[in-house]
Every structure is written in structure tokens, then in C-alpha cells.
């Protein structure tokens, strides 16, 4: 059976480190990191997620700021708030919780965030820096950054020569994940819905990353023996065994089957999920260090 990669434990390590480095920054007479979270509307899942981000920011010793705006907020009003946050030296990270209401252009909002405060890593400048290997000053999207940390906990920092297959080509996970693996000297293939003979391709992977949003699509016999499997998917499926109308969370990988083949695998829940908020804190801390003229910490 595969080693189970405990994302919750690694995320707790990251948060502990962020907390300690925040205390060091303040001890040097610098301002504590500031994270501003902006939420528009009353989507219940977004509310829960934002509350968790704000709570973790406070735990890290950050200055935590939250703007909760009504669903009818205009694009112009939201852009004004972002401009104010861009100009505020007490704010190092700005995060706009997605999705936004239909009348607001999410792309326009994200590109309005100052790149040095774009701790989600979605601004074109940060995307470009990641794509060209400028990792010293880039902010990497939190889910792939967290996934990479989990891979390195198993495989070490140097991944030279390993074959990596990323299933999924989204701008939020698939593409940045592939760029991170390239930067670590992997041989990388990106697969997607049009890929021919995906099972055969997946079997070549020493590192297999699943980020397609299809429940248990990747079967056990798609996994190379000893591979490291990172399951980014979070899917809710019916669970009649729990009672009528009940559901359960599964990933994009058929976990029980894959765990018999893999060398190491992330569970769902408890794998990649906890890493996302932890890496948001790491990015905010890095922004504060860079703003103070200090070398950013690495994780």
C-alpha cells in the first residue's frame, strides 16, 4: 500500500513556519504582513472559505482585513476598493474571492490587483514570471504551490529526470503545476480531455497530478507502480450507504485502487485541500518580506 501524504500535517508545518517568520519580521521593526480578502455576494461556500482564510491569517499574526460587499456591488465600486488596497502600505496581499457575480468581469478585477500584492498568483505578470522561471519574485497559485511542496516532501527538492504527467490544463492548477515541475527539471506532459490513450500516458508518470474535476476518473491500473499521485480534485458524489440524500467527497483518482499501485498518494479530503490556505499565508508573508527589502523565505 502507498504512503498516504498527509496534507493537513504539512499545512500545519507551513503555518507554524509563517507564524515564526512573522514574529521575526516584527522583531526587526518591520510592519506585520497584511492580507485583505474581498468577497462579493453571499455564496455560502465562499463565506466558509473566506472565514477560514481570515482565521488562519490572524493565527499567523497578520493584519487581517475583510471587505464583504453586497451582490449588486458595481464593477466600478469593486475596482475602487482594489485601487485603495493597492495604495495601502499596510496591505501586502489582496485576494478577491471567486466566483464573482455575473455582471462583474473577473479577469478585469484580477488584473487590477498590483502584481506584488497578487497572492493568488493570477495576474498576467506573475503568470509570465512562473512561465519564464522567475520564481524568486513570482507569486505562484496556491493549489499548485501546495501540491509541489507535497511532492518535494516525498521525492526531495531535485526531481531531475522524473516523468510528470499533469491531467488538466486549467490556468489555476494544470498550467502552473506543469511550469513548477519543469522548473524542478521534470520531463512534463500535460494531458486533457482530447488526449489520446490517456491511461497509457498516465502509466509513464513517476509523478501523476490529477486536476480535471471528474470523480474517480483515474483508475488504479492507470498508475505506474511506485508513482507519486497528487489528487487535486474535490467532487461531491451521492452516498446512499450513508442515508437518503447523503453525499461524500472524492477526488479525481479512484483512491482505493490507486493506493495499491502508487508509492505515495494524497487522500481526498485531507491532501491538497489544506495546503491551499497554507500557501496563501506563505505568499502573503513573502510579499511582506519583499516589501521590506528582505529575501523572501522559501518553504
UniProtKB/Swiss-Prot annotation:
Could you list this entry's UniProt keywords, alphabetically sorted: Amino-acid biosynthesis, Histidine biosynthesis, Hydrolase, Methionine biosynthesis, Multifunctional enzyme, NADP, One-carbon metabolism, Oxidoreductase, Purine biosynthesis
Domain of life of the native organism: Bacteria
Q: In which pathway does it act?
A: One-carbon metabolism; tetrahydrofolate interconversion
Q: Which catalytic reaction applies to this protein? A: (6R)-5,10-methylene-5,6,7,8-tetrahydrofolate + NADP(+) = (6R)-5,10-methenyltetrahydrofolate + NADPH; (6R)-5,10-methenyltetrahydrofolate + H2O = (6R)-10-formyltetrahydrofolate + H(+)
So what EC number does this one have? Answer: 1.5.1.5, 3.5.4.9
One annotated Gene Ontology cellular component of this protein: cytosol
Q: What Gene3D superfamilies is this protein classified in?
A: Leucine Dehydrogenase, chain A, domain 1 (3.40.50.10860), NAD(P)-binding Rossmann-like Domain (3.40.50.720)
Q: Which InterPro entries match?
A: Aminoacid_DH-like_N_sf, NAD(P)-bd_dom_sf, THF_DH/CycHdrlase, THF_DH/CycHdrlase_cat_dom, THF_DH/CycHdrlase_CS, THF_DH/CycHdrlase_NAD-bd_dom
Outline the subunit composition. Answer: Homodimer.
The UniProt family comment states: Belongs to the tetrahydrofolate dehydrogenase/cyclohydrolase family.
Function (record text): Catalyzes the oxidation of 5,10-methylenetetrahydrofolate to 5,10-methenyltetrahydrofolate and then the hydrolysis of 5,10-methenyltetrahydrofolate to 10-formyltetrahydrofolate.
Q: What is this protein called?
A: Bifunctional protein FolD 1
Q: What lineage, starting at the top, does this entry show?
A: Bacteria, Pseudomonadati, Pseudomonadota, Alphaproteobacteria, Hyphomicrobiales
Gene label = folD1
Amino acid at each position: 500500500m502507498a504512503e498516504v501524504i498527509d496534507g493537513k500535517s504539512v499545512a500545519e508545518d507551513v503555518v507554524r513556519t509563517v507564524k515564526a517568520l512573522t514574529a521575526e519580521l516584527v522583531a526587526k521593526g518591520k510592519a506585520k504582513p497584511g492580507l485583505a480578502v474581498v468577497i462579493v455576494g453571499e455564496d455560502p461556500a465562499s463565506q466558509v472559505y473566506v472565514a477560514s482564510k481570515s482565521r488562519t491569517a490572524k493565527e499567523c499574526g497578520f493584519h487581517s482585513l475583510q471587505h464583504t460587499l453586497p451582490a449588486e456591488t458595481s464593477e466600478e465600486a469593486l475596482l475602487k476598493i482594489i485601487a485603495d488596497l493597492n495604495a495601502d502600505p499596510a496591505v501586502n496581499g489582496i485576494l478577491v474571492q471567486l466566483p464573482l457575480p455575473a455582471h462583474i468581469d473577473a479577469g478585469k478585477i484580477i488584473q487590477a490587483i498590483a502584481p506584488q500584492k497578487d497572492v493568488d498568483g493570477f495576474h498576467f505578470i506573475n503568470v509570465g514570471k512562473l512561465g519564464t522561471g522567475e520564481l524568486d519574485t513570482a507569486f505562484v497559485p496556491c493549489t499548485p504551490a501546495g501540491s509541489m511542496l507535497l511532492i518535494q516532501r516525498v521525492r526531495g527538492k531535485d526531481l531531475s529526470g522524473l516523468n510528470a504527467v499533469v491531467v488538466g490544463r486549467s490556468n489555476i492548477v494544470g498550467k502552473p503545476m506543469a511550469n513548477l515541475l519543469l522548473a524542478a527539471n521534470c520531463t512534463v506532459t500535460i494531458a486533457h480531455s482530447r488526449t489520446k490513450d490517456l491511461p497509457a500516458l498516465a502509466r509513464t508518470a513517476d509523478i501523476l497530478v490529477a486536476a480535471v474535476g471528474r470523480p474517480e476518473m483515474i483508475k488504479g491500473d492507470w498508475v505506474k507502480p511506485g508513482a507519486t499521485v497528487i489528487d487535486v480534485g474535490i467532487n461531491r458524489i451521492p452516498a446512499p450507504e450513508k442515508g437518503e440524500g447523503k453525499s461524500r467527497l472524492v477526488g479525481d483518482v479512484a483512491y482505493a485502487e490507486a493506493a495499491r499501485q502508487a508509492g505515495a498518494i494524497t487522500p481526498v479530503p485531507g491532501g491538497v485541500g489544506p495546503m491551499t490556505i497554507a500557501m496563501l499565508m506563505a505568499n502573503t508573508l513573502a510579499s511582506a518580506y519583499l516589501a521590506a527589502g528582505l529575501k523572501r523565505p522559501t518553504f
